[in-house]
């Protein structure tokens, strides 16, 4: 029977997320995008709603309790993740390419054609890689314990701590494979096991059950695989960078300055702007037909980073003089929020150490105990805490992506989210990133809260099929260590070089 309350929750939560997404666009969008770019805005709203829904489906799966709530969760998970894949690989890139088309050519057909070309390139690369890997490695190998025989000894109880038992019955010797009439049944022997209930089993635990997974499940695996790569890099960086920047921004907050100081700093910013204009013209002159060399693309990414830092410095200068330092209470709120974020990040890292790395026999359940206790006290408390912890990981991914592009390798242009100054291409890029990593974050949370999610459909999907695929299964062994290691390396790097500085552009 379908649980009416769960249906209401399943409808209301996505609706609230969609409304929140609409407010997010209104709050962050650039003035140039007001009353225009409706198609990208619709994609952003749907993408954020889809990502949030996929993460919040985990507590719904728990509440459903293996089908007692009436939802076919195994089917719903497959459907939601296929839709996530379509949005992340096709729809978001298409909307982004369409938005970024050259304004000099106003023909809608030209914009659509350009968007189709870019999207097709991404889709073709993903499809080709998926098909090749599916043909060779689309087989799951599930370790199994094969019970060759099982019998009961009558009137002779066996305790797990008992001494070896000797029997002279030829029948029993034949069952367990003995060559003589006498055989010892040892409860401590991994092949001849007594379970403390008068039963003895002869086991062979080196067998693997092999089966080819469906193409839909393998597509989900590929999305999860790439999501994990991004989550390891950006999530690991963001776990440290998010609280670090919130706290250090308070230290470097705009201070009230006199007029002469304002003019001096404004002059320096103007000189930097003039230099960047010349650099931009040089980069543009070396670009033919929209095609950039690897070196020019790196310079272009460095150029965008320098522009961003210049705009940040100018905004701080305006706040320091024209607004006399701004609203101090907001900086204090961010400062205390940074310590809250620090506590959450430390909580996640500690949970990784004492529960996830030490599995299957963890030192302590830690966050599992918190979520389960709150869930037992009142179901929504556990869901709220789970939602906050999982969405915090999404924020860390977005922050880590921005920090990565700003400070490290400049492999792709930065797409910062700034209040009242965020273009739609930045929205679309970050939504695509959130969609891809939402799959890996759900997988991560399934393992992190395994005591909370042990009977769920998503746990069976990830732990049975996805985690046991050929070749790829070795990747799942190291990713938890990789996230922790990335966070430690980021902490060391940020303490050595805490300030963002413009990169040197070699044109």
Swiss-Prot record:
InterPro entries: LMBR1-like_membr_prot. It comes from Dictyostelium discoideum. It is found in: Membrane. Keywords: Membrane, Transmembrane, Transmembrane helix. Its main location: membrane. The lineage of its organism: Eukaryota, Amoebozoa, Evosea, Eumycetozoa, Dictyostelia. PANTHER family: LIMR FAMILY PROTEIN DDB_G0283707-RELATED. This is LIMR family protein DDB_G0293610. One of its GO terms (cellular component) is membrane. Belongs to the LIMR family.
């Amino acid at each position: 029977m379908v649980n009416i309350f769960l249906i209401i929750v399943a409808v209301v939560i996505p609706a609230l997320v969609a409304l929140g997404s609409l407010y997010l666009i209104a709050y962050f969008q650039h003035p140039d995008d007001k009353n225009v770019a409706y198609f990208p805005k619709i994609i952003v709203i749907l993408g954020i709603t889809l990502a949030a829904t996929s993460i919040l489906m985990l507590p719904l799966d728990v509440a459903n309790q293996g089908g007692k709530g009436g939802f076919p969760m195994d089917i719903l998970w497959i459907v939601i993740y296929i839709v996530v894949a379509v949005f992340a690989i096709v729809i978001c890139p298409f909307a982004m390419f369409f938005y970024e088309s050259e304004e000099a050519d106003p023909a809608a057909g030209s914009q659509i054609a350009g968007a189709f070309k870019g999207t097709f390139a991404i889709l073709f690369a993903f499809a080709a890689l998926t098909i090749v890997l599916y043909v060779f490695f689309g087989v799951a190998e599930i370790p199994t314990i094969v019970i060759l025989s099982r019998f009961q000894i009558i009137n002779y109880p066996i305790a797990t701590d008992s001494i070896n038992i000797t029997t002279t019955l030829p029948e029993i010797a034949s069952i367990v494979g003995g060559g003589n009439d006498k055989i010892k049944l040892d409860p401590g022997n991994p092949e001849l096991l007594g379970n403390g209930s008068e039963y003895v089993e002869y086991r062979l635990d080196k067998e693997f059950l092999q089966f080819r997974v469906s193409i839909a499940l393998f597509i989900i695996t590929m999305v999860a695989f790439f999501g994990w790569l991004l989550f390891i890099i950006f999530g690991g960086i963001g776990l440290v960078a998010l609280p670090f920047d919130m706290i250090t921004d308070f230290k470097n907050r705009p201070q009230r300055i006199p007029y002469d100081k304002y003019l001096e700093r404004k002059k320096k910013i103007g000189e930097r702007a003039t230099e960047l204009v010349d650099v931009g013209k040089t980069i543009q002159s070396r670009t033919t037909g929209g095609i950039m060399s690897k070196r020019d693309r790196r310079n272009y990414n460095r150029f965008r980073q320098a522009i961003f830092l210049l705009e940040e410095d100018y905004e701080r200068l305006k706040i320091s003089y024209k607004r006399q330092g701004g609203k101090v209470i907001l900086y204090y709120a961010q400062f205390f929020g940074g310590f809250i974020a620090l506590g959450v990040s430390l909580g996640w890292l500690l949970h990784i150490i004492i529960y996830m790395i030490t599995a299957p026999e963890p030192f302590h359940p830690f966050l599992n105990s918190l979520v389960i206790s709150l869930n037992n006290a009142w179901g929504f408390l556990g869901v709220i805490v789970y939602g906050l912890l999982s969405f915090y990981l999404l924020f860390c991914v977005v922050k880590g992506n921005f920090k990565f592009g700003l400070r490290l390798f400049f492999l792709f242009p930065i797409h910062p989210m700034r209040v009242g100054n965020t273009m739609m291409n930045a929205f679309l890029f970050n939504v695509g990133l959130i969609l891809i990593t939402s799959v890996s974050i759900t997988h991560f949370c399934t393992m992190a809260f395994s005591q909370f999610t042990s009977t769920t459909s998503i746990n069976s999907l990830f732990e049975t099929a996805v985690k046991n695929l050929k070749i790829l299964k070795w990747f799942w062994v190291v990713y938890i260590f990789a996230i922790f290691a990335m966070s430690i390396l980021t902490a060391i790097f940020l303490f050595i070089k805490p300030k963002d500085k413009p990169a040197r552009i070699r044109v």
